[in-house]
Amino acid sequence: MTNVTDQQLELIKKSIQFVPNYPKKGILFRDITELLKNPQAYSASITLLAYYYRNHKLTKVVGIEARGFLFSAPLALILKLGFIPARKSGRLPRDTIREPYILEYDNGFLEIHTDSITPGDQVLIIDDLLATGGTIAAAVKLIRRLGGEVNHAGFIIDLENLGGKSLLKEIGINSYSLVTFSNH
């Protein structure tokens, strides 16, 4: 890596704050709002993801509600790809398909519009954070059910000790994260 890239990654890492016992006791939450507030850190996060995925043969970017939208939509614009929101149940206005997910502190359903992915689409999934991999696994199932091909997922943060990267590897997804934290 270049010094510029190392400096950008350090800026990103330093802009992520730790909030204990949020949203429930025992969870050490990674807060990205400081990253978003800092235009250099926010821009660096999008730029580095765009650089990494620039030569992948992609047609769409699926962003995971809600914080994933903050990175996936600008990334889709830079890469000149379509953007597809994957939302929690009941928040999309037209026909959808849905898939259950189970997280460290939440569960529910993830949905996408039935006409958002077409057979043969090469799809990249983007979210702010990889923890257990439950939400991404649900998104992968949705994309594949609609005939899309998905082999990649990108993140700002990987919480490596929660096993998300291993889960994604088991279902054929290569994951890439800008920063990694090993403590929970």
UniProtKB/Swiss-Prot annotation:
Pathway: Purine metabolism; AMP biosynthesis via salvage pathway; AMP from adenine: step 1/1. Keywords: Cytoplasm, Glycosyltransferase, Purine salvage, Transferase. Transmembrane segments: none annotated. It catalyses: AMP + diphosphate = 5-phospho-alpha-D-ribose 1-diphosphate + adenine. It is found in: Cytoplasm. GO terms for cellular component: cytoplasm. Its EC number is 2.4.2.7. GO terms for molecular function: adenine binding; adenine phosphoribosyltransferase activity; AMP binding. NCBIfam families: apt, PRK02304.1-1, PRK02304.1-3, PRK02304.1-5. HAMAP family: Aden_phosphoribosyltr. Catalyzes a salvage reaction resulting in the formation of AMP, that is energically less costly than de novo synthesis. Belongs to the purine/pyrimidine phosphoribosyltransferase family. This is Adenine phosphoribosyltransferase. It comes from Blochmanniella pennsylvanica (strain BPEN).
